[in-house]
Curated annotation (Swiss-Prot):
Post-translational modification: Phosphorylated. Phosphorylation upon DNA damage induces relocalization to the nuclear plasma.
Cited InterPro entries: 5-3_exonuclease_C_sf, Flap_endonuc, HhH2, PIN-like_dom_sf, XPG-I_dom, XPG/Rad2, XPG_CS, XPG_DNA_repair_N
Coiled-coil parts of chain: none
Location of region: Interaction with PCNA: 336-344
Originating species: Drosophila grimshawi (Hawaiian fruit fly)
Subunit structure: Interacts with PCNA. Three molecules of FEN1 bind to one PCNA trimer with each molecule binding to one PCNA monomer. PCNA stimulates the nuclease activity without altering cleavage specificity.
Membrane keyword on record: no
Names of the cofactor(s): Mg(2+)
Lineage: Eukaryota, Metazoa, Ecdysozoa, Arthropoda, Hexapoda
UniProt GO molecular function: 5'-3' exonuclease activity; 5'-flap endonuclease activity; DNA binding; magnesium ion binding; manganese ion binding; RNA-DNA hybrid ribonuclease activity
Protein name: Flap endonuclease 1
UniProt keyword list: DNA damage, DNA repair, DNA replication, Endonuclease, Exonuclease, Hydrolase, Magnesium, Metal-binding, Mitochondrion, Nuclease, Nucleus, Phosphoprotein
Length: 388
């Protein structure tokens, strides 16, 4: 789930914290990628005639196709990816996992009804909702990455937390995920849309943690409390408190304890036995492997091993796999250049620049609303996954 409404809140109140870039602008960067998020995207998006790609025995191969070609694209653009896989979820996430199980049950019932009605659009819709990443998908992805010469890390718990630890330790430049809670875990940089297909033409969105805090005028601890109020994976939120009210409360009272002492409980329903303190602890001190003990190495691809793994029963085209392996080797050999900005120190933004960016964001928002009013808006426009 991530943090509900956080990306929009940052765009509205801390616009300088977001920068849009082309993928090529991350040349020379090492990036920790949320592997489970990627595999889910590939299982959903990589399809043929509406169905997942599959091996001879019917097992899906969409995740392998996506992982192979998107990783080649990253390396081709000079990016050195390291994939981080989820471990066991924390106990505090059991409530969120139970909700997801309920939604899957509902989707299964809806799929059955759509199948009986012969509604192809609804069948595809609910089939996608039932997609989930299994241990076998992850195992196969790790085997593929090993053959490609790309490192991966098994997180003891949450992948986003482990990615953030790698960033904070200077092992990588950024965390790449669609879940905004990478910022709550303290990742200095967060990249969204990095692993999206080229055809979607989505610029990469880069969030800067320091500029988020600066723009929202919060400390790191206050930011964590804000995220808990907005809605996270580890506990319920206060009913009636959305992003706007959450930031108002944090700025007024600075922490959840003081908010609870002053909030009108008749107006805002505080969850019974609300375990926000444990959620806070999970963000401040998550269960991660010490980044200093992790050695990241990118090695030459095993071309014959890739052919053996992907072709045959998995039905990949051998010529394309061999061409992909050659691209991997060429990219590795080319990655000896150094980014120019590694020689220079980046200066922090001035308060005047931040204020100017906020004014510009407000003007853009007003202009967009004005245009919507003139042309009538259209509820079908801009469909897609809602940012978290």
């Amino acid at each position: 789930m991530g943090i509900l409404g956080l990306s929009k809140l940052i765009a509205d109140l801390a616009p300088l914290a977001i920068r849009e870039s082309e993928i090529k602008n991350f040349f020379g960067r090492k990036v920790a990628i949320d592997a489970s998020m990627c595999l889910y995207q590939f299982l959903i998006a990589v399809r043929s005639e509406g169905a997942q790609l599959a091996a001879v025995n019917g097992d899906p191969t969409s995740h392998l196709m996506g992982m192979f070609y998107r990783t080649i694209r990253l390396l081709d653009n000079g990016i050195k990816p390291v994939y981080v896989f989820d471990g066991a979820p924390p106990d505090m996430k059991s409530g969120e996992l139970a909700k997801r199980a309920e939604r899957r049950d509902e989707a299964e019932k809806a799929l059955k009804a759509a199948t009986e009605a012969g509604d192809e659009a609804q069948i595809e819709k609910f089939n996608r909702r039932l997609v989930r990443v299994t241990k076998e998908h992850s195992r196969e992805a790790k085997e593929l990455l090993k053959l490609m010469g790309v490192p991966y890390v098994d997180a003891p718990c949450e992948a986003e937390a482990q990615c953030a630890a790698l960033v904070k330790a200077g092992k990588v430049y950024a965390t790449a995920t669609e879940d905004m809670d990478a910022l709550t875990f303290g990742s200095c940089k967060l990249l969204r849309y990095l692993t999206y297909s080229e055809a979607r033409k989505m610029p990469v969105k880069e969030f800067s943690y320091d500029k988020v805090l600066q723009g929202l005028e919060l400390t790191s601890k206050e930011f964590i409390d804000l995220c808990i109020l907005m809605g996270c994976d580890y506990c319920e939120s206060i009913r009636g408190v959305g992003p706007k009210r959450a930031i108002e409360l944090i700025k007024s009272y600075r922490d959840i304890e003081t908010i609870l002492e002053n909030i009108d409980t008749n107006k805002y329903a505080v969850p019974e036995n609300w375990n926000y303190k444990r959620a806070r602890e999970l963000f401040i001190e998550p269960d991660v492997t010490d980044a200093s003990t992790i050695d990241l190495k990118w090695t030459d691809p095993d071309e014959d091993g890739l052919v053996q793994f992907l072709c045959g029963d998995r039905q990949f085209n051998e010529e394309r796999v061999r061409n992909g392996a050659k691209k991997l080797l060429k990219s590795k050999q080319a990655q000896t250049q150094v980014r120019l900005d590694s020689f220079f120190k980046t200066l922090p933004s001035s308060p005047n620049a931040i204020a100017a960016a906020k004014r510009k964001a407000e003007e853009s928002k007003k202009s967009a609303n004005s245009k919507k009013a003139k042309i009538g808006g259209g509820s079908g426009a801009g469909r897609g996954r809602r940012p978290k």
